[in-house]
Amino acid sequence: WSVDGVNFTRNATNPIFAPKAGDWNCGRAIDAEVIFAKGKYFLYYATRTPDYVKQIVGVATAPAGTNFNRETWTEACDRAILVPEWPWEETCIEAPSVVEMNGTLYMFYAGAYNNRPQQIGLATSTDGIHWRKVSNKPFLANGDPGAWNYCESGHPHIFKDKDGQTYLFYQGNEDFGRTWFLSQRKIIWRDGFPQLK
């Protein structure tokens, strides 16, 4: 936790959450993001199938007023909430980032591993647990040959500022990971749907 956003103190109960290894996951959690919505906290994370073949997304929840300690988080369901299914996603869904707009949750996620190329997809939910992918194509694709993001547009983070404007931050590179760049795109909302400006 931090009071100034610069200096942080580690939670004494770290790790505050680890999924229970079993039929659907290997017991690890990475790329975590927490959002408060629907009267509770959601912790979205990437994990892998028990055979470590596919990267998938899971979710845990904690009640409003939580101190974020380990004992407050519980797995919200006994399955992955998002899995790779389209050709461009290959065997990986990771780096979920969620924003709520007018009661609907929008998840921006990375599909495929770094430099495959990784691209950004979009899914929606009304309860934070059951998700539907918006399209079988990326929301934000990698760039053309020679572009700064030719090898990937990945690991998204959706950010809403105090004025309500949303921005999609993401990483990219053109040389298969030897150098990395960060960028952002402004998101505009039309008929309740995000679009790149």
Predicted regions and their residues:
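Carbohydrate-active catalytic/glycan-binding domains of CAZyme proteins
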Residues: 1-197
